[in-house]
Structures are given as C-alpha cells and as structure tokens.
C-alpha cells in the first residue's frame, strides 16, 4: 500500500465539483461524514484570504458589541499569507485591531520572547508590528522561567485566557511532518 500520496494529489485532476460544492445540498452530501468542517481551496492564497476574511468578520462583530476578539496565533511560516492579507485589510480597508487580544500559542524553552529566534518575535515581525494592536493586549509564554514553575505558569496562562472569555479563533501552523 502506498502512503504519503498528498504530494501526488493535484486539484487540476479533480473536478471542482468534489471540493467546491455549488450549493448547500451539495455541500451537505460532500461533508456528511466529516467531524470537523473542512473547506478545500485551489490555492494557498485563496485559502489564506478566506481565513483572513473570517478573522476580520469576527473582529468586526466583536467591535460592534464592544467586546475583545481573542486570537491565539503562531509565528510559524504556515500563516504568513493570512497575516499578509490581514495587514492589507488594516492598511487599505481600515480594519482595526484595537479590540484584539493575542495569545502566542507557544514559545521555545529556554528562550526569551524578544530573542531573535523566538516564536513571539517572529509573530511580531510578520504581523503584530504592522497593525494597530495595543501592546498591552499581547501575551506570550515566558521561556525564561525556572523549570520547577512551568506547570503553575501554564495554569496561570490558561486562567488569563479564560479571564478574557476564552479564545475566539486559534490559527495553527502546519509543519511538513504533519505536526499541528
């Protein structure tokens, strides 16, 4: 049996009908066995634009009711196109991030958040430094704490997330070895 066929699957060999349903009925037929709703796009750019649009809509909905939008983000390479589109929306469409709170999904240990190789530093360079988010609304794990305090620190990090009502959207990265 062959495994790892994902590199051999191309959408130009598959009719769009099988991944781009024309109506709700077709979508229900295609997705009836899915446990997690999944959309397939013809390009990474098209997918990134849709994700950015959905994030922007959530931010705007929260703004309308005077609430924070809580995002959990990563500094990896996978969401780079999403961040680029959100920056474009901020610059050209005046999407504001003033009501956004960001929790960094992970950090390397032992590494300070401002270290050149830190996940948080990458997230700032790719995205956060280019939008109008309040720096007080940025949270990241401290990679410099003592090992014997990590468990307690993680509990406090989760409590901080809960204090803002939980996470509205988590944008995960995918590494080539199928890690998420």
Q: Which residues does each predicted region cover?
A:
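Short glycine-rich or small-residue beta-strand-to-loop segments that form or flank ligand, phosphate
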Residues: 70-74, 103-106
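N-terminal glycine-/serine-/threonine-rich phosphate-binding loop
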Residues: 2-71
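Conserved small/polar residues in nucleotide/adenosyl-binding loops
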Residues: 176-180
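Generic structural signal for well-ordered alpha-helical scaffold segments
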Residues: 52-60, 87, 91, 124-128, ...
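Glycine-rich beta-strand-to-loop/alpha-helix junction loops that act as flexible
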Residues: 73-78, 174
């Amino acid at each position: 049996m062959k495994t790892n066929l994902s590199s051999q699957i191309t959408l130009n060999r598959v009719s769009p009908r099988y991944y781009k349903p024309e109506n709700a009925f077709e979508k229900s037929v295609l997705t009836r066995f899915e446990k997690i709703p999944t959309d397939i796009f013809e390009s990474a750019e098209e997918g990134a634009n849709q994700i950015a649009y959905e994030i922007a809509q959530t931010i705007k909905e929260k703004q309308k009711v005077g609430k924070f939008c809580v995002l959990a983000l990563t500094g990896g390479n996978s969401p780079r196109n999403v961040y680029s589109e959100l920056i474009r929306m901020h610059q050209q469409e005046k999407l504001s991030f003033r009501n956004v709170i960001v929790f960094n999904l992970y950090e390397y240990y032992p590494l300070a958040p401002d270290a050149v190789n830190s996940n948080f530093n990458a997230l700032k360079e790719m995205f956060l430094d280019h939008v109008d988010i309040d720096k007080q609304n940025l949270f990241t794990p401290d990679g410099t704490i003592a090992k014997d305090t990590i468990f307690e620190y993680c509990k406090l990090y989760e409590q901080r997330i809960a204090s803002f009502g939980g996470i509205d959207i988590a944008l995960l990265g995918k590494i080539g070895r199928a890690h998420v």
